[in-house]
UniProtKB/Swiss-Prot annotation:
Job of this protein: Transcriptional activator that specifically binds 5'-GATA-3' or 5'-GAT-3' motifs within gene promoters.
Zinc finger (GATA-type): 213-269
Highest taxon of the lineage: Eukaryota
Record-given protein name: GATA transcription factor 24
Family: Belongs to the type IV zinc-finger family. Class C subfamily.
Species the sequence originates in: Arabidopsis thaliana (Mouse-ear cress)
Disordered, as annotated region: 178-203
Residue ranges of every copy of the Tify domain listed in the record: 73-108
Gene: GATA24
Compartments where found: Nucleus
GO cellular component: nucleus
Length: 297
């Protein structure tokens, strides 16, 4: 330490804390704080350059190495500031070799040989200052730029429901309607199927109507109507030419039955006449019974 108290040593009395603060800087206006290490630039706007570091009060304890090394370049006239127990020592025109010797003697730290000339990004500053554990924060211009990019990108995102009326109109014109309302293709197919079935049923009804208009079929052997027999059967003249009884006789024996033993077939008119005669006969019998009862009394 004797060679550092040389010709240009100046002692300044001030208020400081126990950690020794060593500053190696250029001629300029700088503000040194033990906690935050704030640096103010020169009034002319130029960036003065220098090296600043904190040296612990106990050299043997490596846990107290909470220091900073800020590089601002090397020029001819450099200052070395030592603060210890409230006293500040300032030395002018100190070579980097002497500062290196002091750092090695006190803290075992070395000054990098090639020091950057300008202050870089916060990440680079933290790496130079030895504060790798501190969180990285973007500067204000970078944050503004990122916010602007995010807002521009957000403008491209459209979360609103935009209604394209032209497209909707084309779709509406292509869709099928029933009584003015939209219907699906399935329902339209069902409707077409139902209309087809209705048409088929109507056609069958028309066929039935035409069938009712056909002449009544009679048995060609006995003259029995098709309505009076269970079914018409095949005969020698073809299908549906014989009544049920004649057709069975023909199918089993190959001959037609004898009509002399069979009562004549009764037509519906004959049946109605027989019913009327039976009713009249019953009425006469009832009258006779009532007459006999009155005579006995």
């Amino acid at each position: 330490m004797d060679d550092l108290h040389g010709r240009n040593g100046r002692m300044h009395i001030g208020v400081a804390q126990n950690p020794m603060h060593v500053q190696y800087e250029d001629h300029g206006l700088h503000h040194i704080d033990n906690e935050n290490s704030m640096m103010d630039d020169h009034a002319d706007g130029g960036m003065d350059e220098g090296v600043e570091t904190d040296i612990p009060s106990h050299p043997g304890n490596s846990a107290d190495n909470r220091g900073e090394v800020v590089d601002r370049g090397i020029e001819n006239g450099d200052q070395l500031t030592l603060s210890f127990q409230g006293q500040v020592y300032v030395f002018d025109r100190v070579s980097p070799e002497k500062v290196q010797a002091v750092l090695l003697l006190l803290g075992g730290r070395e000054v990098p040989h090639t020091l950057p000339t300008t202050l870089g990004s916060p990440h680079q500053n933290n790496r130079v200052l030895g504060l790798s554990g501190t969180p990285q924060r973007l500067s204000v211009p970078q944050r503004l730029a990122s916010l602007l990019r995010f807002r521009e990108k957000r403008k491209g995102r459209n979360f609103d429901k935009t209604i394209r009326y032209t497209v909707r109109k084309e779709v509406a014109l292509r869709m099928q309607r029933k009584k003015g309302q939209f219907t699906s293709a399935k329902s339209s197919n069902d409707d077409s199927g139902s209309t087809g079935s209705d048409w088929g049923s109507n056609q069958s009804w028309a066929v039935e109507g035409t069938e009712t208009q056909k002449p009544e079929v009679l048995c060609r052997h006995c003259g029995t109507s098709e309505k009076s027999t269970p079914m018409m059967r095949r005969g020698p003249d073809g299908p549906r030419t014989l009544c049920n009884a004649c057709g069975l006789m023909w199918a089993n024996k190959g001959t037609l039955r004898d009509l002399s033993k069979v009562p004549p077939p009764q037509t519906p008119q004959h049946l109605s006449l027989n019913k009327n005669e039976d009713a009249n006969l019953e009425a006469d019998q009832m009258m006779e019974v009532t007459g006999d009862i009155s005579n006995t009394q």
